[in-house]
Amino acid sequence: MGAESGRSDMASAEQVVRDFCAAASGGNPDAMRAFFSDDVVYHNIPMAPAEGIAATMELIDGFMGMFEKLEFEIHHLASDGPTVLTERTDHFTLNGKTAPLPVMGAFHVVDGKITAWRDYFDMGQVTAMLSGD
């Protein structure tokens, strides 16, 4: 594989993640589903991983159903081949109040599909957000 091809793969993996984050911000879980491989592993690091598209979508549907709005704000994005890292603030709106959550995300993209997604964040902030603190 030549250097040109490597740059193209990196650019496409980055674009997949950018497009995925935009779809997540749209609040439509079905739009997010289109970005996942069938064997995707989604792991919010403070919790147990969801393995496979059905388990991943069950987790996303449940989580997104708790909020009126979700927006992924990407601050920095870096990639190395199929691996894409995002430094984000995820903004969750609940009962008309928006709460920011700093997140570090790691994605693995193969053939234009996300095969792994890990998010690192402070679970205490999520608990406080859900309890209205």
What are these regions (language model features)?
Residues 1-34, 38, 133:
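Short, low-complexity N-terminal intrinsically disordered segments enriched in polar/charged residues
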Residues 29-33, 37-82:
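A solvent-exposed, acidic/Ser-Thr-rich amphipathic alpha-helical stretch
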Residues 32, 80-83, 107-114:
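Short, solvent-exposed coil/turn segments at beta-strand boundaries
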Residues 60, 72-77, 89-90, 102-107:
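Hydrophobic/aromatic beta-strand elements that line small-molecule binding cavities or substrate pockets
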Residues 85, 99-101:
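Anionic, Ser/Thr-rich low-complexity intrinsically disordered regions
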Residues 86-94:
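Short beta-strand segments that buttress and anchor functional surface loops
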Residues 96-98, 126-131:
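A short, polar/proline- and glycine-enriched secondary-structure boundary/capping micro-motif
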Residues 106-128:
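Short beta-strand edge/turn micro-motifs at domain boundaries
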